[in-house]
Every structure is written in structure tokens, then in C-alpha cells.
Amino acid sequence: SIMFSDFAGFTKHVEHMEPKALIELLNQYFSAFDKIIFNHKLEKIKTIGDAYMCASGLPAESRGHAIRICLGALEIQNFLERSNEKREKMRMQRWDMRIGIHTGPVIAGVVGERKFTYDIWGDSVNIAALMEQHGEPGRINISETTYQQVSEIFETENRGSINSGKKGDLPMYFLNRLKEEFSEDPDGIKANSVFQQKFGGLMKIYDA
């Protein structure tokens, strides 16, 4: 499973920012994301400007990779919302993200000679990017294949489809939260003991 995210209206945000302040702010956000995805055993792929990309189910396998990445995305979204609440109290502009997730096969490997980079390629990467591009600020947009693997666990919203050209119509869903019976907190961000009992086996990581 692949997650793409970027800040909505980034160009407008940075027009009046000093370079040092921008770098410090991006570092603050991306460092927080790094901690979140580490806790969910996700693999950071790269950052490009204001975009952040990670994946689940590689390099070590996990049958619950789609669940893991959705839990990570919800926690990232929750972190951003708490951050924006603080910014609004200080009369500062909100920084909202569009997050897109797709589940499917990818090619993964290390490339380069002097500066090695672990990266992923394939149609699944492109579809994850489309999910992000056609999302909304402050929301998590998931594909049909991700939805099929997580709909028993999370509350979702059907959004209809987008036409992707070669791939035809791609159904999309908003991922809102964990279902109440699986949630430890009122916001549906953290999984509870009922979730662990029912889905704990799926969440195991198997070394490749």
C-alpha cells in the first residue's frame, strides 16, 4: 500500500515566508510524520518539496499493510488538525494536507551509485498519486482496492469515480476514522484491544 501526501496551496503559503522559516516548518512536520510512520512500521520512501511518500508491506511483508497505512494516515491527519488548532489561536494560516492511498503491486529497489535511493515504481504508485491529487484538503482519499481491505474496520464515504484515462474509472472513498467498536479514543484514531484481538494476526510483520 502506498501513501502520497502534500500540502494544499503550498505555493501560496510560502510566498511571504523566509526560506529559513519554511525549512524549519517543513522539518517540524516531516519529523513528526517520520515518528508516526515508524510507530506503524511503515517505510518512508521520500519527500519531494512539500510532498511526503511512504509505503506499507515492503521491504518486509505484512498481510495487514493496508490497515497499517490507514492507521498511520489517520494519525498524521490528527497531528495536522491539532497543529492547525494551535496555529488558528495564534492567528496563523492553516496548513492542510491532501492524503491519497492505493493498494497494489509495485517494483521496489535501490538505485544510484553515489547517493543510494530506495524507491518504488509501477501503476500502483501512479494511482496513489491520483488519489492524492483528487482528494480534498484535510481528508484522506483511498482507492477501491484499499477500501476492499479496510472497510470492515474503518468508517468510509463513497465519493464516486474519476476517469484516469488508460485505467478507466477509479472509484474513490474518504477514510474518516476507525469504527467505534475498534477505537480506543472518541476520534477513531487509535486501535483498541478488540481490534488487536480480531486483527492482530494480520498486523504481524514477516521479514522478506
Name the predicted role of every residue range.
Residues 1-12, 50:
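Catalytic-site or vestigial catalytic-site microsegments of nucleotide-handling domains
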Residues 3, 20-41, 72-75:
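Active-site-proximal alpha-helical element of nucleotidyl cyclase-like catalytic domains
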Residues 5, 36-68, 82-125, 149, ...:
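Catalytic core of nucleotidyl cyclases, primarily class III adenylyl/guanylyl cyclases
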Residues 10, 29, 33, 52:
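Hydrophobic framework residues that shape the active-site pocket
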Residues 13-25, 44, 68:
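Conserved catalytic/dimerization core of cyclic nucleotide/dinucleotide signaling enzymes
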Residues 30, 34, 77-84, 105, ...:
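Structural signal for well-ordered, non-membrane alpha-helices
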Residues 106-108, 134-208:
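Cytosolic regulatory/linker segments at or just downstream of nucleotide-handling modules
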